[in-house]
Protein backbone atom coordinates (compact mmCIF):
# COMPACT_ATOMS: atom_id res chain seq x y z
CA UNK A 1 0.00 0.00 0.00
CA UNK A 2 1.56 3.27 -1.06
CA UNK A 3 1.28 5.44 1.99
CA UNK A 4 0.62 8.87 0.50
CA UNK A 5 -2.99 8.26 -0.64
CA UNK A 6 -3.73 6.61 2.72
CA UNK A 7 -2.31 9.56 4.68
CA UNK A 8 -4.27 12.00 2.55
CA UNK A 9 -7.49 10.02 3.20
CA UNK A 10 -6.91 10.14 6.97
CA UNK A 11 -6.01 13.84 7.02
CA UNK A 12 -9.26 14.66 5.13
CA UNK A 13 -11.45 13.08 7.85
CA UNK A 14 -13.38 15.23 10.33
CA UNK A 15 -15.45 13.20 12.78
CA UNK A 16 -17.74 15.18 15.06
CA UNK A 17 -20.97 15.00 17.05
CA UNK A 18 -23.54 17.65 17.83
CA UNK A 19 -24.40 18.29 21.47
CA UNK A 20 -27.27 20.40 22.72
CA UNK A 21 -30.17 20.63 25.11
CA UNK A 22 -33.50 19.27 23.78
CA UNK A 23 -35.16 21.65 21.32
CA UNK A 24 -32.11 23.87 20.83
CA UNK A 25 -32.36 22.93 17.13
CA UNK A 26 -29.92 20.07 16.81
CA UNK A 27 -31.86 17.92 14.37
CA UNK A 28 -32.57 20.99 12.23
CA UNK A 29 -28.89 21.89 12.14
CA UNK A 30 -28.03 18.27 11.22
CA UNK A 31 -30.39 18.58 8.26
CA UNK A 32 -28.85 21.84 7.11
CA UNK A 33 -25.32 20.47 7.47
CA UNK A 34 -26.32 17.58 5.20
CA UNK A 35 -27.90 20.02 2.76
CA UNK A 36 -24.58 21.88 2.49
CA UNK A 37 -22.78 18.56 2.15
CA UNK A 38 -25.15 17.80 -0.76
CA UNK A 39 -26.20 14.62 1.03
CA UNK A 40 -29.87 15.60 0.74
CA UNK A 41 -31.51 17.89 -1.76
CA UNK A 42 -34.20 19.44 0.42
CA UNK A 43 -34.19 19.58 4.20
CA UNK A 44 -37.04 18.03 6.20
CA UNK A 45 -38.17 19.30 9.60
CA UNK A 46 -38.68 17.01 12.56
CA UNK A 47 -42.34 17.47 13.42
CA UNK A 48 -43.89 16.80 10.00
CA UNK A 49 -46.21 19.63 9.01
CA UNK A 50 -48.39 18.36 6.19
CA UNK A 51 -45.96 17.74 3.38
CA UNK A 52 -42.75 18.63 5.25
CA UNK A 53 -40.51 15.59 5.01
CA UNK A 54 -39.41 13.67 8.06
CA UNK A 55 -35.91 14.74 9.00
CA UNK A 56 -33.38 12.38 7.45
CA UNK A 57 -31.54 11.47 10.61
CA UNK A 58 -34.56 10.37 12.67
CA UNK A 59 -35.39 6.96 11.36
CA UNK A 60 -36.63 4.56 14.04
CA UNK A 61 -40.44 4.27 14.23
CA UNK A 62 -40.56 5.59 17.77
CA UNK A 63 -38.62 8.66 16.65
CA UNK A 64 -40.91 9.32 13.73
CA UNK A 65 -43.88 9.21 16.08
CA UNK A 66 -42.45 11.48 18.73
CA UNK A 67 -40.45 13.91 16.63
CA UNK A 68 -37.21 13.27 18.50
CA UNK A 69 -33.91 11.57 17.69
CA UNK A 70 -33.66 8.52 19.92
CA UNK A 71 -30.82 6.66 18.27
CA UNK A 72 -27.41 7.79 17.22
CA UNK A 73 -27.14 7.76 13.48
CA UNK A 74 -24.04 8.36 11.42
CA UNK A 75 -23.85 10.39 8.25
CA UNK A 76 -20.90 10.92 5.95
CA UNK A 77 -20.61 13.72 3.40
CA UNK A 78 -17.95 15.77 1.60
CA UNK A 79 -17.46 19.46 2.44
CA UNK A 80 -14.70 21.77 1.18
CA UNK A 81 -11.76 19.35 0.77
CA UNK A 82 -12.76 17.21 3.75
CA UNK A 83 -14.84 14.13 4.31
CA UNK A 84 -17.08 14.77 7.29
CA UNK A 85 -18.51 12.06 9.56
CA UNK A 86 -21.37 13.48 11.59
CA UNK A 87 -22.64 11.45 14.53
CA UNK A 88 -26.13 12.52 15.45
CA UNK A 89 -26.91 12.06 19.14
CA UNK A 90 -30.33 12.12 20.80
CA UNK A 91 -30.81 15.58 22.26
CA UNK A 92 -34.16 14.88 23.85
CA UNK A 93 -34.77 14.55 27.57
CA UNK A 94 -35.24 10.93 26.71
CA UNK A 95 -31.78 10.01 25.72
CA UNK A 96 -29.40 7.39 26.98
CA UNK A 97 -25.79 6.60 27.67
CA UNK A 98 -25.47 6.13 23.92
CA UNK A 99 -25.17 9.88 23.75
CA UNK A 100 -22.34 9.93 26.26
CA UNK A 101 -20.52 7.07 24.59
CA UNK A 102 -20.84 8.55 21.11
CA UNK A 103 -18.77 11.46 22.39
CA UNK A 104 -15.89 9.03 22.97
CA UNK A 105 -15.86 8.19 19.25
CA UNK A 106 -15.43 11.72 17.84
CA UNK A 107 -12.50 14.12 17.45
CA UNK A 108 -14.50 17.32 17.94
CA UNK A 109 -18.01 18.51 18.84
CA UNK A 110 -20.43 21.17 17.69
CA UNK A 111 -22.31 22.68 20.61
CA UNK A 112 -25.68 24.15 19.61
CA UNK A 113 -27.11 26.73 22.02
CA UNK A 114 -30.54 28.34 21.85
CA UNK A 115 -29.53 32.01 22.02
CA UNK A 116 -32.79 32.84 23.82
CA UNK A 117 -32.06 30.37 26.61
CA UNK A 118 -28.28 30.16 26.94
CA UNK A 119 -26.54 27.22 28.61
CA UNK A 120 -29.03 24.54 29.67
CA UNK A 121 -28.85 21.44 31.82
CA UNK A 122 -28.30 18.73 29.20
CA UNK A 123 -25.55 20.78 27.55
CA UNK A 124 -23.73 21.01 30.89
CA UNK A 125 -23.88 17.22 31.32
CA UNK A 126 -22.64 16.50 27.82
CA UNK A 127 -19.84 19.04 28.20
CA UNK A 128 -18.65 17.18 31.31
CA UNK A 129 -18.23 14.09 29.13
CA UNK A 130 -16.25 15.99 26.46
CA UNK A 131 -14.01 17.25 29.27
CA UNK A 132 -12.87 13.67 29.95
CA UNK A 133 -10.93 13.85 26.67
CA UNK A 134 -10.50 17.64 26.23
CA UNK A 135 -12.50 17.47 23.00
CA UNK A 136 -12.34 20.64 20.86
CA UNK A 137 -15.72 22.42 20.72
CA UNK A 138 -17.17 24.68 18.00
CA UNK A 139 -20.23 26.69 19.15
CA UNK A 140 -23.30 27.68 17.13
CA UNK A 141 -25.69 30.20 18.71
CA UNK A 142 -29.01 29.29 17.15
CA UNK A 143 -32.46 30.88 16.63
CA UNK A 144 -31.29 34.44 15.92
CA UNK A 145 -34.46 34.87 13.85
CA UNK A 146 -36.32 34.90 17.19
CA UNK A 147 -35.95 37.32 20.07
CA UNK A 148 -32.84 36.30 21.97
CA UNK A 149 -30.78 37.36 24.97
CA UNK A 150 -27.92 39.84 24.67
CA UNK A 151 -25.19 37.84 22.85
CA UNK A 152 -22.44 39.14 25.19
CA UNK A 153 -24.43 37.84 28.16
CA UNK A 154 -24.72 34.36 26.59
CA UNK A 155 -20.97 34.30 25.83
CA UNK A 156 -20.26 35.19 29.47
CA UNK A 157 -22.53 32.35 30.55
CA UNK A 158 -20.62 29.85 28.37
CA UNK A 159 -17.32 31.07 29.83
CA UNK A 160 -18.51 30.95 33.44
CA UNK A 161 -20.60 27.79 33.38
CA UNK A 162 -18.63 25.64 30.95
CA UNK A 163 -15.17 27.01 31.69
CA UNK A 164 -14.28 27.80 28.06
CA UNK A 165 -13.14 31.07 26.56
CA UNK A 166 -15.33 32.26 23.68
CA UNK A 167 -13.87 33.73 20.49
CA UNK A 168 -16.68 35.06 18.25
CA UNK A 169 -15.97 34.46 14.56
CA UNK A 170 -19.25 35.98 13.39
CA UNK A 171 -21.45 38.55 15.15
CA UNK A 172 -25.23 39.01 14.74
CA UNK A 173 -26.78 42.12 13.23
CA UNK A 174 -30.10 42.46 15.04
CA UNK A 175 -32.32 39.56 16.07
CA UNK A 176 -35.91 38.35 15.78
CA UNK A 177 -37.81 40.20 13.05
CA UNK A 178 -34.90 42.64 12.87
CA UNK A 179 -32.29 39.93 12.18
CA UNK A 180 -30.35 41.16 9.13
CA UNK A 181 -27.35 38.83 9.02
CA UNK A 182 -23.90 38.49 10.57
CA UNK A 183 -20.58 40.27 10.37
CA UNK A 184 -17.72 37.83 9.81
CA UNK A 185 -14.89 39.13 11.99
CA UNK A 186 -12.14 37.10 10.28
CA UNK A 187 -13.17 37.98 6.74
CA UNK A 188 -14.20 41.58 7.48
CA UNK A 189 -17.48 41.19 5.62
CA UNK A 190 -21.20 41.26 6.35
CA UNK A 191 -23.35 38.38 5.10
CA UNK A 192 -26.99 39.41 4.72
CA UNK A 193 -29.92 37.23 5.78
CA UNK A 194 -33.21 36.83 3.96
CA UNK A 195 -36.04 34.84 5.55
CA UNK A 196 -38.07 32.17 3.78
CA UNK A 197 -35.16 30.07 2.45
CA UNK A 198 -35.08 27.46 5.23
CA UNK A 199 -35.25 24.46 2.92
CA UNK A 200 -32.63 25.49 0.39
CA UNK A 201 -29.21 27.09 0.20
CA UNK A 202 -29.50 30.88 0.11
CA UNK A 203 -27.85 33.06 -2.44
CA UNK A 204 -24.96 34.70 -0.60
CA UNK A 205 -25.10 38.49 -0.41
CA UNK A 206 -21.96 40.08 0.98
CA UNK A 207 -20.92 43.61 1.91
CA UNK A 208 -17.15 44.02 2.24
CA UNK A 209 -15.80 46.01 5.20
CA UNK A 210 -17.53 47.23 8.35
CA UNK A 211 -17.39 50.90 7.37
CA UNK A 212 -18.94 50.35 3.95
CA UNK A 213 -21.89 52.80 3.53
CA UNK A 214 -23.75 49.98 1.75
CA UNK A 215 -24.17 48.39 5.19
CA UNK A 216 -26.15 51.43 6.44
CA UNK A 217 -28.25 51.29 3.29
CA UNK A 218 -29.10 47.59 3.65
CA UNK A 219 -29.68 47.24 7.42
CA UNK A 220 -30.61 50.80 8.37
CA UNK A 221 -28.37 53.51 9.84
CA UNK A 222 -29.19 53.03 13.51
CA UNK A 223 -28.70 49.23 13.43
CA UNK A 224 -25.43 49.64 11.49
CA UNK A 225 -24.20 52.18 14.05
CA UNK A 226 -25.07 49.98 17.02
CA UNK A 227 -23.38 46.95 15.42
CA UNK A 228 -20.17 48.94 14.88
CA UNK A 229 -20.32 50.01 18.50
CA UNK A 230 -20.98 46.45 19.73
CA UNK A 231 -18.15 45.07 17.65
CA UNK A 232 -15.69 47.56 19.11
CA UNK A 233 -16.66 46.23 22.53
CA UNK A 234 -16.51 42.59 21.40
CA UNK A 235 -13.04 42.99 19.88
CA UNK A 236 -11.84 44.52 23.15
CA UNK A 237 -13.50 42.07 25.53
CA UNK A 238 -13.29 38.70 23.77
CA UNK A 239 -10.10 36.77 23.07
CA UNK A 240 -8.99 36.23 19.49
CA UNK A 241 -9.29 32.74 18.08
CA UNK A 242 -6.27 30.62 19.02
CA UNK A 243 -6.02 27.22 17.36
CA UNK A 244 -3.83 25.67 20.08
CA UNK A 245 -6.30 26.61 22.81
CA UNK A 246 -9.15 25.33 20.64
CA UNK A 247 -7.47 21.95 20.16
CA UNK A 248 -7.06 21.50 23.93
CA UNK A 249 -10.72 22.35 24.59
CA UNK A 250 -9.95 25.64 26.36
CA UNK A 251 -11.41 28.02 23.77
CA UNK A 252 -14.39 27.73 21.45
CA UNK A 253 -14.97 29.64 18.19
CA UNK A 254 -18.55 31.00 18.20
CA UNK A 255 -20.88 31.40 15.20
CA UNK A 256 -24.33 32.99 15.12
CA UNK A 257 -27.25 32.12 12.87
CA UNK A 258 -30.57 30.36 12.45
CA UNK A 259 -30.64 26.68 11.53
CA UNK A 260 -34.35 26.83 10.66
CA UNK A 261 -33.71 29.79 8.35
CA UNK A 262 -30.64 27.97 7.02
CA UNK A 263 -28.31 30.84 7.74
CA UNK A 264 -24.86 30.71 9.34
CA UNK A 265 -24.51 26.93 9.18
CA UNK A 266 -22.04 27.12 6.29
CA UNK A 267 -19.85 29.65 8.16
CA UNK A 268 -19.66 27.17 11.05
CA UNK A 269 -18.86 24.27 8.67
CA UNK A 270 -16.07 26.32 7.09
CA UNK A 271 -14.50 26.81 10.53
CA UNK A 272 -15.03 23.22 11.59
CA UNK A 273 -13.40 21.75 8.50
CA UNK A 274 -10.52 24.23 8.64
CA UNK A 275 -9.70 23.98 12.36
CA UNK A 276 -11.11 20.77 13.82
CA UNK A 277 -8.53 18.00 14.10
CA UNK A 278 -8.17 15.08 11.72
CA UNK A 279 -8.29 11.66 13.46
CA UNK A 280 -6.06 11.72 16.51
CA UNK A 281 -3.88 9.33 18.48
CA UNK A 282 -5.92 7.13 20.83
CA UNK A 283 -4.91 5.60 24.11
CA UNK A 284 -5.06 1.86 24.44
CA UNK A 285 -4.19 0.18 27.72
CA UNK A 286 -1.03 -1.25 26.08
CA UNK A 287 0.19 1.81 24.12
CA UNK A 288 -0.88 4.88 22.16
CA UNK A 289 -2.17 4.10 18.67
CA UNK A 290 -1.54 6.65 15.88
CA UNK A 291 -4.30 7.18 13.32
CA UNK A 292 -1.71 6.98 10.54
CA UNK A 293 -0.45 3.48 11.40
CA UNK A 294 -0.84 0.97 8.55
CA UNK A 295 -2.41 -1.76 10.64
CA UNK A 296 -6.16 -1.64 11.21
CA UNK A 297 -7.64 -1.13 14.68
CA UNK A 298 -11.02 0.06 15.92
CA UNK A 299 -13.44 -0.10 18.85
CA UNK A 300 -17.19 -0.55 19.23
CA UNK A 301 -18.91 2.36 20.98
CA UNK A 302 -22.54 1.52 20.38
CA UNK A 303 -24.83 -1.31 19.40
CA UNK A 304 -28.09 -0.55 17.68
CA UNK A 305 -30.91 -3.01 17.25
CA UNK A 306 -33.37 -3.14 14.38
CA UNK A 307 -31.81 -0.65 12.05
CA UNK A 308 -33.72 -2.47 9.38
CA UNK A 309 -37.25 -3.46 10.42
CA UNK A 310 -37.18 -6.09 7.65
CA UNK A 311 -34.30 -7.90 9.37
CA UNK A 312 -34.07 -8.46 13.09
CA UNK A 313 -30.45 -7.51 13.10
CA UNK A 314 -28.17 -5.62 15.40
CA UNK A 315 -25.44 -3.36 14.14
CA UNK A 316 -22.29 -2.63 16.11
CA UNK A 317 -20.95 0.85 15.37
CA UNK A 318 -17.17 0.84 15.18
CA UNK A 319 -14.86 3.83 15.15
CA UNK A 320 -11.76 3.07 13.08
CA UNK A 321 -8.73 4.26 15.05
CA UNK A 322 -5.93 3.36 12.62
CA UNK A 323 -5.31 1.82 9.22
CA UNK A 324 -7.81 0.88 6.52
CA UNK A 325 -10.80 -1.43 6.44
CA UNK A 326 -11.15 -3.38 3.19
CA UNK A 327 -14.03 -5.64 2.35
CA UNK A 328 -13.43 -9.27 3.37
CA UNK A 329 -10.43 -8.52 5.59
CA UNK A 330 -9.59 -10.71 8.60
CA UNK A 331 -9.60 -9.11 12.04
CA UNK A 332 -8.79 -10.22 15.55
CA UNK A 333 -11.80 -9.84 17.89
CA UNK A 334 -9.56 -9.21 20.90
CA UNK A 335 -11.95 -9.98 23.78
CA UNK A 336 -12.81 -13.39 22.30
CA UNK A 337 -9.30 -14.03 20.93
CA UNK A 338 -10.94 -15.00 17.65
CA UNK A 339 -10.12 -14.29 14.00
CA UNK A 340 -13.17 -13.05 12.11
CA UNK A 341 -13.59 -12.22 8.46
CA UNK A 342 -15.68 -9.08 7.86
CA UNK A 343 -17.10 -8.79 4.39
CA UNK A 344 -20.38 -7.00 5.00
CA UNK A 345 -19.54 -3.87 7.01
CA UNK A 346 -21.73 -0.90 6.11
CA UNK A 347 -21.34 2.85 5.91
CA UNK A 348 -24.22 5.18 6.60
CA UNK A 349 -26.23 7.98 5.23
CA UNK A 350 -28.89 7.91 7.94
CA UNK A 351 -31.23 5.07 7.16
CA UNK A 352 -29.57 4.36 3.80
CA UNK A 353 -26.90 1.78 4.28
CA UNK A 354 -24.36 0.90 1.67
CA UNK A 355 -21.71 -1.77 1.82
CA UNK A 356 -18.31 -0.39 2.68
CA UNK A 357 -15.48 -1.39 0.36
CA UNK A 358 -12.91 0.83 2.04
CA UNK A 359 -12.98 2.89 5.21
CA UNK A 360 -10.18 4.79 6.92
CA UNK A 361 -9.13 5.97 10.36
CA UNK A 362 -11.80 8.39 11.59
CA UNK A 363 -14.65 6.63 9.78
CA UNK A 364 -17.52 4.83 11.47
CA UNK A 365 -18.55 1.48 10.05
CA UNK A 366 -21.35 -0.88 11.05
CA UNK A 367 -20.70 -4.56 11.73
CA UNK A 368 -23.52 -7.09 11.73
CA UNK A 369 -23.75 -8.45 15.24
CA UNK A 370 -25.35 -11.74 16.10
CA UNK A 371 -24.84 -11.38 19.83
CA UNK A 372 -21.06 -11.80 19.94
CA UNK A 373 -20.03 -8.12 19.94
CA UNK A 374 -20.20 -5.92 23.04
CA UNK A 375 -19.66 -2.22 23.65
CA UNK A 376 -15.96 -1.50 24.17
CA UNK A 377 -14.80 -4.46 22.04
CA UNK A 378 -11.59 -3.89 20.08
CA UNK A 379 -10.85 -5.31 16.62
CA UNK A 380 -7.28 -5.28 15.27
CA UNK A 381 -5.09 -6.82 12.59
CA UNK A 382 -3.51 -9.21 15.08
CA UNK A 383 -2.29 -7.12 18.00
CA UNK A 384 -4.01 -7.45 21.39
CA UNK A 385 -5.17 -3.94 22.23
CA UNK A 386 -7.87 -2.60 24.51
CA UNK A 387 -8.89 1.02 23.92
CA UNK A 388 -9.63 2.92 27.09
CA UNK A 389 -12.14 5.67 27.74
CA UNK A 390 -15.40 4.00 26.70
CA UNK A 391 -17.31 4.39 29.94
CA UNK A 392 -20.47 3.02 31.49
CA UNK A 393 -22.26 5.79 33.40
CA UNK A 394 -24.19 5.23 36.61
CA UNK A 395 -27.91 5.44 35.80
CA UNK A 396 -30.03 8.21 37.28
CA UNK A 397 -33.46 6.56 37.06
CA UNK A 398 -34.52 3.14 38.34
CA UNK A 399 -37.55 0.84 38.02
CA UNK A 400 -38.27 -2.71 39.11
CA UNK A 401 -39.31 -4.82 36.11
CA UNK A 402 -41.91 -7.55 36.49
CA UNK A 403 -43.29 -10.20 34.15
CA UNK A 404 -46.93 -10.55 33.24
CA UNK A 405 -46.20 -14.27 32.74
CA UNK A 406 -43.87 -15.54 35.52
CA UNK A 407 -42.84 -18.57 33.42
CA UNK A 408 -40.81 -16.35 31.10
CA UNK A 409 -38.17 -15.37 33.68
CA UNK A 410 -35.39 -16.93 31.58
CA UNK A 411 -36.29 -15.01 28.41
CA UNK A 412 -36.62 -11.80 30.43
CA UNK A 413 -33.14 -12.17 31.91
CA UNK A 414 -31.66 -13.05 28.51
CA UNK A 415 -33.35 -10.04 26.92
CA UNK A 416 -32.25 -7.65 29.65
CA UNK A 417 -28.64 -8.87 29.60
CA UNK A 418 -28.48 -8.50 25.79
CA UNK A 419 -30.06 -5.05 25.95
CA UNK A 420 -27.58 -4.04 28.64
CA UNK A 421 -24.62 -5.28 26.54
CA UNK A 422 -26.01 -3.10 23.80
CA UNK A 423 -26.13 -0.12 26.14
CA UNK A 424 -29.90 0.30 25.81
CA UNK A 425 -30.31 0.00 29.56
CA UNK A 426 -28.50 -1.28 32.66
CA UNK A 427 -29.74 -4.18 34.71
CA UNK A 428 -29.07 -4.92 38.39
CA UNK A 429 -29.80 -8.13 40.31
CA UNK A 430 -29.87 -7.54 44.09
CA UNK A 431 -27.94 -10.19 46.06
CA UNK A 432 -30.72 -10.66 48.60
CA UNK A 433 -33.77 -11.21 46.40
CA UNK A 434 -34.88 -12.15 42.90
CA UNK A 435 -35.83 -8.64 41.80
CA UNK A 436 -34.61 -7.28 38.49
CA UNK A 437 -33.92 -3.56 38.62
CA UNK A 438 -33.50 -1.59 35.42
CA UNK A 439 -31.44 1.61 35.42
CA UNK A 440 -31.43 4.32 32.76
CA UNK A 441 -30.21 7.84 32.11
CA UNK A 442 -33.41 9.01 30.35
CA UNK A 443 -37.08 8.08 30.80
CA UNK A 444 -37.59 7.01 27.20
CA UNK A 445 -35.11 4.16 27.68
CA UNK A 446 -37.71 2.41 29.84
CA UNK A 447 -40.35 2.57 27.08
CA UNK A 448 -37.84 1.37 24.52
CA UNK A 449 -36.88 -1.64 26.66
CA UNK A 450 -40.47 -2.80 27.21
CA UNK A 451 -41.28 -2.38 23.50
CA UNK A 452 -38.19 -4.32 22.46
CA UNK A 453 -38.65 -7.10 25.04
CA UNK A 454 -42.07 -7.64 23.51
CA UNK A 455 -41.08 -7.49 19.84
CA UNK A 456 -37.71 -9.28 20.03
CA UNK A 457 -38.03 -11.67 22.98
CA UNK A 458 -41.81 -12.14 23.11
CA UNK A 459 -41.85 -11.11 26.77
CA UNK A 460 -44.50 -8.82 28.25
CA UNK A 461 -43.15 -6.85 31.17
CA UNK A 462 -44.31 -3.95 33.31
CA UNK A 463 -42.52 -1.55 35.65
CA UNK A 464 -43.00 -0.76 39.32
CA UNK A 465 -41.42 1.96 41.39
CA UNK A 466 -38.35 0.98 43.40
CA UNK A 467 -36.61 2.69 46.29
CA UNK A 468 -33.29 3.39 44.55
CA UNK A 469 -31.77 6.86 44.16
CA UNK A 470 -28.43 5.99 42.60
CA UNK A 471 -25.98 3.16 41.92
CA UNK A 472 -22.18 3.01 42.17
CA UNK A 473 -19.69 0.37 41.06
CA UNK A 474 -17.72 -0.85 44.04
CA UNK A 475 -13.99 -1.60 44.05
CA UNK A 476 -11.47 -2.19 46.82
CA UNK A 477 -7.83 -3.26 46.58
CA UNK A 478 -7.93 -4.87 50.03
CA UNK A 479 -9.80 -8.20 49.83
CA UNK A 480 -10.38 -8.32 53.60
CA UNK A 481 -11.95 -4.86 53.70
CA UNK A 482 -14.08 -5.64 50.66
CA UNK A 483 -15.29 -8.79 52.38
CA UNK A 484 -16.24 -6.83 55.51
CA UNK A 485 -18.00 -4.21 53.37
CA UNK A 486 -20.00 -6.95 51.59
CA UNK A 487 -21.00 -8.62 54.87
CA UNK A 488 -22.28 -5.38 56.36
CA UNK A 489 -24.07 -4.10 53.24
CA UNK A 490 -25.76 -7.18 51.75
CA UNK A 491 -29.12 -5.41 51.53
CA UNK A 492 -27.66 -2.70 49.26
CA UNK A 493 -25.54 -4.83 46.95
CA UNK A 494 -26.36 -6.08 43.46
CA UNK A 495 -24.63 -7.47 40.37
CA UNK A 496 -24.95 -5.61 37.07
CA UNK A 497 -25.37 -7.21 33.63
CA UNK A 498 -21.64 -7.99 33.50
CA UNK A 499 -21.62 -9.42 37.06
CA UNK A 500 -19.82 -6.39 38.51
CA UNK A 501 -20.51 -5.59 42.15
CA UNK A 502 -22.72 -2.52 42.58
CA UNK A 503 -23.92 -0.53 45.58
CA UNK A 504 -27.57 0.47 45.26
CA UNK A 505 -28.39 3.46 47.46
CA UNK A 506 -31.97 4.36 48.47
CA UNK A 507 -30.89 8.00 49.03
CA UNK A 508 -27.83 10.16 48.40
CA UNK A 509 -27.48 10.52 52.18
CA UNK A 510 -27.21 6.73 52.44
CA UNK A 511 -24.47 6.71 49.78
CA UNK A 512 -22.49 9.45 51.53
CA UNK A 513 -22.71 7.60 54.85
CA UNK A 514 -21.45 4.40 53.23
CA UNK A 515 -18.51 6.35 51.75
CA UNK A 516 -17.68 7.76 55.19
CA UNK A 517 -17.92 4.38 56.92
CA UNK A 518 -15.80 2.58 54.33
CA UNK A 519 -13.10 5.05 53.18
CA UNK A 520 -11.04 2.27 51.54
CA UNK A 521 -13.86 1.27 49.21
CA UNK A 522 -14.16 3.12 45.91
CA UNK A 523 -17.67 4.05 44.78
CA UNK A 524 -17.40 4.79 41.07
CA UNK A 525 -19.97 6.71 39.01
CA UNK A 526 -18.40 5.45 35.76
CA UNK A 527 -16.87 2.14 34.81
CA UNK A 528 -14.76 1.24 31.78
CA UNK A 529 -16.30 -1.23 29.38
Swiss-Prot record:
Binding-site residues, GTP: 20-27, 88-92, 142-145
Pfam families, sorted: EF-G_D2, GTP_EFTU, RF3_C
CDD domains, per database record: RF3 (cd04169), RF3_II (cd03689), RF3_III (cd16259)
Domain of life: Bacteria
Annotated tr-type G domain residues: 11-280
An example Gene Ontology molecular-function term: guanosine tetraphosphate binding
UniProt keyword list: Cytoplasm, GTP-binding, Nucleotide-binding, Protein biosynthesis
Location relative to the cell: Cytoplasm
GO cellular component, one term: cytosol
Listed GO biological process terms: regulation of translational termination
TM regions (residue ranges): none
Key word Nucleotide-binding present: yes
Biological role: Increases the formation of ribosomal termination complexes and stimulates activities of RF-1 and RF-2. It binds guanine nucleotides and has strong preference for UGA stop codons. It may interact directly with the ribosome. The stimulation of RF-1 and RF-2 is significantly reduced by GTP and GDP, but not by GMP.
Cross-referenced NCBIfam families: prfC, PRK00741.1, small_GTP
Family assignment from sequence similarity: Belongs to the TRAFAC class translation factor GTPase superfamily. Classic translation factor GTPase family. PrfC subfamily.
Protein name: Peptide chain release factor 3
Source organism of this protein record: Vibrio parahaemolyticus serotype O3:K6 (strain RIMD 2210633)
Gene: prfC
Amino acid sequence: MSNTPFLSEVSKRRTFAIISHPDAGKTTITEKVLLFGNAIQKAGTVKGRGNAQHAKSDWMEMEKERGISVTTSVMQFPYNDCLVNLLDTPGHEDFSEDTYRTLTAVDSCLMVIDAAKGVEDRTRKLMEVTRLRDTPIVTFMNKLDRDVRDPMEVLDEVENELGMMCAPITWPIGCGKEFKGVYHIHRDETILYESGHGHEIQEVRIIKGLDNPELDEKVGESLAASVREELELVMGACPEFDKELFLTGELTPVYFGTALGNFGVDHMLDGLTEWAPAPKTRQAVERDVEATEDKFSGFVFKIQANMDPKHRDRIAFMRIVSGTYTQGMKMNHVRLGKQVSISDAVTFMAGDRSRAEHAYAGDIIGLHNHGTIQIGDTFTQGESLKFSGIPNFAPELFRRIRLKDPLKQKQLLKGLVQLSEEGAVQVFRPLQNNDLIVGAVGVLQFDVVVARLKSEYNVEAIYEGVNVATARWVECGDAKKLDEFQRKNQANLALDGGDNLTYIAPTMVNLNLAKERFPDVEFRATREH
